[in-house]
Design a protein with these regions (language model features):
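Long recognition/docking surfaces used for binding and targeting
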Residues: 1-18
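Gly-rich Lys/Arg/Thr-decorated short loops/hinges at beta-loop-alpha junctions or inter-strand turns
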Residues: 16-19, 144-150
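Conserved S-adenosyl-L-methionine
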Residues: 24-134, 139-141, 150, 158, ...
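Short glycine-dipeptide loop
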Residues: 172-178
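Short, solvent-exposed loop/turn elements at beta->coil junctions and helix N-caps
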Residues: 212-217
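Flexible, glycine-/basic-rich loop-and-beta segments that form/coincide
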Residues: 218-235
Length: 235
């Protein structure tokens, strides 16, 4: 069976599970139409690096790969895309396995999976990236997680979504683009939220806020938005 066919079958299974609220898989799945819209706006280019710091089953990374794979026939660029361009993190071992399998069935990471089982908030990023696509988990940090205390963050907070936003802000290259799904509290919360929003507006071009319909996520009726921003800090 052709690899693309295997991959499509696997994606369909993941999507069906994502639509099943009783299975609990919905927390790992972002609707494909929303993923595609976020990729279309950020426009990743072959030769660039793409990261999802809360990658779930790898939908964003796979969509970015599909967007870039026909941009060039240059072997070096295609090898880079397949082996080095994509970076994903998730702190749940089962989900990392699902994501790795999902990408593998599309011919990505055949020698080494680009997905790491790691809480991406715990450490400063080792490298900066060109594009970030993410739908971080809503709610509080899992039981047993360490408190986030990072010198590269703008402010200390226990708000998981604000910490993910800070993490993405510090890991973008100059001129990098990000699209991230975040709940309403990120837009309206005072204190740490106000500080982070001020930094976002000062050092980045927050060009679009896309309001999502309530219930767009299969397992939760959370009011959410997509923030699209460019890194343009003065150097």
């Amino acid at each position: 069976m052709d690899g693309d066919v295997k991959g499509a079958i696997n994606e369909s299974i993941l999507e069906k599970n994502g639509q099943d609220k009783k299975s609990g898989a919905g927390q790992y799945f972002t609707p494909r139409s929303l993923i595609q819209a976020m990729v279309d706006v950020t426009r990743p280019q072959i030769g660039e690096t793409v990261c999802d710091p809360a990658c779930g089953t790898g939908g964003f990374l796979l969509a970015a790969y599909d967007y870039m794979k026909n941009q060039s026939q240059d072997k070096a660029k295609r090898d880079f895309l397949r082996d080095k361009a994509l970076h994903g993190y998730d702190n749940t071992a089962l989900v990392v396995t699902l994501a790795s399998m999902n990408l593998y069935l599309h011919g990505i990471g055949t020698d080494r999976s680009p997905i790491l089982c790691q809480d991406s908030l715990e450490k400063q990023p080792q490298t900066l990236v060109d594009v970030i696509l993410a739908n971080p988990p809503f709610g509080t940090r899992p039981a047993g997680s360490v408190d986030i205390d990072r010198p590269d963050f703008y402010v200390e907070t226990k708000n998981n979504q604000l910490n993910f936003l800070q993490h993405m802000m510090v890991m973008l290259k100059n001129g990098g683009r990000a699209a991230v799904v975040l709940p309403d509290n990120v837009l309206f919360e005072g204190g740490a939220g106000e500080t982070i929003r001020r930094e976002l507006l000062k050092n980045f071009n927050l060009h679009t806020i896309l309001r999502l319909p309530t219930g767009i996520f299969y397992a939760q009726g959370v009011k959410a938005n997509v923030l699209f921003f460019l890194e343009n800090k003065p150097y």
